[in-house]
Amino acid sequence: MKELVSLAESAARAAGAILRSYFQQEYTITHKGLDDPVTNADTEADAFLKEKLLSACPDYGWLSEESADSAERLTKSRVWIVDPLDGTKEFIAGRPEFMVSIGLAENGQPVLGVLYNPINDELFSAYKGQGAFLNGSRISCTQTKTLSEARLIVSRSELIENLWQPYRHFFKTLQPCGSVAYKLALVASGKADIHISLKPKNEWDICAAHCLL
């Protein structure tokens, strides 16, 4: 498993370099659906990760936000679950709140996670039973016991839509942040106490970060 962590870390850094080369520069934006943008930075990083990870692990399955899904992955015991750019809206807005997210599931359970913020050079990694790390240093969640002392980190769009207005008084602070993966990584490293989402998520949003927690 250590070899797979090293592979995923190397892939995440290289994909992050692709994203960094486009950040606050020129790129194309298309829309997969309502309020669901995708850039050529997303697709280029996705193509790189698919080639890098599957060439090293040809017997593994593949599930990515930016790749066409295939039922063949359901026949595989191990599946890479990837979001090449988690936080596309933040990327487009010029905010450094986005991640390369690489998870590995074994028999349907997350066992490895690597997340990389290429602007802040934050590399989060974990594999099952071995703890979580940020740039090589062990990290852990806070020991906050009560909601009144908790720093809640939430989606910026949910704050803008005032979805949290009825619940603000329960928490010490509400901090906006893009990227589900980044929010969970910040909780795992003790920089926030709780993340709650009021909207549904996909496997590629949470698989890698699940391992950090």
Predicted regions, residues:
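N-terminal subdomain of lithium-sensitive/metallo-dependent phosphomonoesterases centered on the IMPase/IPPase/PAP
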Residues: 1-85
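DPxDG-like acidic metal-binding loop motif
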Residues: 73-135
